[in-house]
């Protein structure tokens, strides 16, 4: 995690953490320590395990997406009926989750249920640039605004089509930018 709390509940970024100070997990309240090495990105790590059983491994792709949003909406704790989890982005009734690493269909569904029951709409951004780059995803011959997925992501292939307005799935298909500097994102519709 990039953010922790001080003893007086101020949010601190790992870059601003000082050695010897005490910091706490915003989800479980357990003590965390700053990891400020030269190999991995600076972050906080639990001294003992966290009660939050969701995995939060963050790649550079993930961090890059989070850094495009204001700090005050990143890694925000969502609490619902005694259960707490950390949203990548929480902004105006929306949770945005960035997914670079594999996630099971069960975990995908579990997270969606938690956030929607807590009253939020969920937007997932999946990194599928490898699939597009390897031509596993290609433009449809019938409609250039649609794509054909030769070997779809197992999680997305197993998900029942979303008929809800509470959940949206977006794919990043390439790291190229258009003339406006925007990433090439495509909303998934079943």
Please provide the spans of the model-predicted regions:
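Short gly/ser-rich anion-binding loops that grip negatively charged ligand groups
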Residues: 51-55, 98
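Active-site metal-binding core of divalent-cation-utilizing nuclease and nuclease-like domains
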Residues: 12-17, 24, 29-34, 60-110, ...
